[in-house]
A protein has these predicted regions:
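Canonical AAA+ ATPase core
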Residues: 92-97, 118, 122, 130-221, ...
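AAA+/P-loop NTPase substrate/partner-engagement loops
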Residues: 66-94
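P-loop (Walker A) phosphate-binding loop of NTP-binding proteins
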Residues: 51, 85, 153
C-alpha cells in the first residue's frame, strides 16, 4: 500500500481545509477552487481567464494566503520590464563586487495579475522560471524555492490593451480555468457578507509549506495503469488527426494530463487514477494547448473539441 493509500484521510482533510478556506473568500466556485489547489499539488501553474470583477485575483490571493509560505503579487503593465520580475545585480562599492537583488519571482506562490497586459518580452521572462524553476541573471542560475507556483490572471484578448500569450507560454500552464459569473444565491451572499478584501485581511494559513511538499510527494506516487496511460495517448493522437485542429496535443500535454489526473485522484482519496479522473480534468488541461484551424479560434470551440475527443475515444474497460 502506498503512502497516499495509508493516509488518504489525512490528505483529504488537508485538501478540504485549503479548499474550504479559499471558499470563505470566493463564494460559489468550489470546482474552480479545487482545480487551483490541484494545480499546486501537481507542481503545475494556473491560468485564470475571465472578465474583470469575477474574483480571479481574490482566488489567487486566497490560495496564497491559505498556505504558510512566501508569496508575491506582480501587476503586469505595458511598461513592466523583465528585470522587474527576476531581479538585478547591484554593484556594491564598499566591497567592490556585485550582489544579486532577487525579484518577486523568488517566492513560493507568485500572482501574475493581468499577465496579458505586459509586453511579449516581459511575458517571456516567466518561461524559464515556470519550466525550469530557476532563473539566470548575468550568467548565474538561481534556484527558486519549492513549492513554486505561478498563478496568472488574464482578461479576454478582445479587451483593449491586451497581448495574446504565445503558445509556448500557454503550454507552461498545467490548467486554465474560468470562474464565470456567480449564481444568484452566491451573489446574494457576496452582497450580504464582507467584501473579499476584508476577508483576505483576516484569512489565516491552514497548511504549512512542509505539508504541501508532503502532499506533492503523495500525488507523485498515485498509480496510473498502462491501460489508462494508453487512453491518454489515444486522446492526444486523436487530436492530431482532427480536421478542425491545426496543431494537436504534444507529448508535454499528455504528461501534464497525467499529472492532473494524479492530483484529481489524490484529492478524492485514491492512490490510483481512473478514466473519470481524465474526463474531469481534460478540458482544463488540454483546451488551451490546441491550435485550431482558421475560423475556429473561440475558446468555447476548444473546450467543445476536447469534449468531442473524450466522446470519440474509447474508454478502457476494467478487467
Amino acid at each position: 500500500m502506498t503512502d497516499i493509500a495509508a493516509s488518504a484521510t489525512s490528505f483529504a482533510t488537508l485538501f478540504d481545509s485549503v479548499v474550504g478556506n479559499i471558499a470563505s473568500v470566493v463564494r460559489g466556485k468550489r470546482d474552480s477552487i479545487e482545480f487551483a489547489v490541484m494545480a499546486l499539488l501537481a507542481e503545475g501553474h494556473l491560468l485564470i481567464e475571465d472578465v474583470p470583477g469575477v474574483g480571479k485575483t481574490s482566488l489567487a490571493k486566497a490560495l496564497a494566503g491559505s498556505i504558510d509560505c512566501t508569496w508575491k503579487r506582480v501587476q503586469f503593465t505595458p511598461d513592466l520590464l523583465p528585470t522587474d520580475l527576476v531581479g538585478v545585480s547591484i554593484y556594491e562599492r564598499s566591497n567592490e563586487r556585485f550582489r544579486f537583488q532577487p525579484g518577486p519571482l523568488f517566492a513560493n506562490i507568485v500572482l501574475a495579475d493581468e499577465i496579458n497586459r505586459a509586453s511579449p518580452k516581459t511575458q517571456s521572462a516567466l518561461l524559464e522560471a515556470m519550466e525550469e524553476r530557476q532563473i539566470s541573471v548575468d550568467g548565474v542560475s538561481h534556484v527558486l524555492p519549492p513549492p513554486f507556483m505561478v498563478i496568472a490572471t488574464q482578461n479576454p484578448v478582445e479587451q483593449e490593451g491586451t497581448y495574446r500569450l504565445p503558445e509556448s507560454q500557454l503550454d507552461r500552464f498545467l490548467l486554465r480555468i474560468s470562474l464565470g459569473y456567480p449564481g444568484r444565491t452566491a451573489e446574494m451572499e457576496i452582497l450580504d457578507g464582507q467584501g473579499a478584501a476584508d476577508q483576505l485581511r483576516v484569512l489565516q494559513p491552514v497548511v504549512s509549506s512542509e505539508e504541501v511538499l508532503s502532499m506533492v510527494k503523495s500525488v507523485r506516487e498515485v498509480y496510473l495503469a498502462s491501460a489508462l496511460k494508453s487512453y491518454m495517448i489515444d486522446i492526444s493522437e486523436a487530436s492530431r488527426r482532427h480536421t478542425s485542429i491545426e496543431l494537436g496535443l504534444s507529448p508535454r500535454a499528455t504528461l501534464q494530463l497525467a499529472a492532473a489526473v494524479r492530483a484529481h485522484a489524490a484529492a478524492h482519496g485514491r492512490d490510483y487514477g481512473t478514466p473519470d479522473d481524465v474526463k474531469a480534468v481534460a478540458v482544463a488541461v488540454l483546451s488551451h494547448r490546441l491550435l485550431l484551424r482558421a475560423g475556429s479560434n473561440a475558446r468555447t470551440s476548444a473546450d467543445d473539441l476536447v469534449r468531442e475527443l473524450l466522446a470519440d475515444v474509447p474508454v478502457p474497460v476494467a478487467r
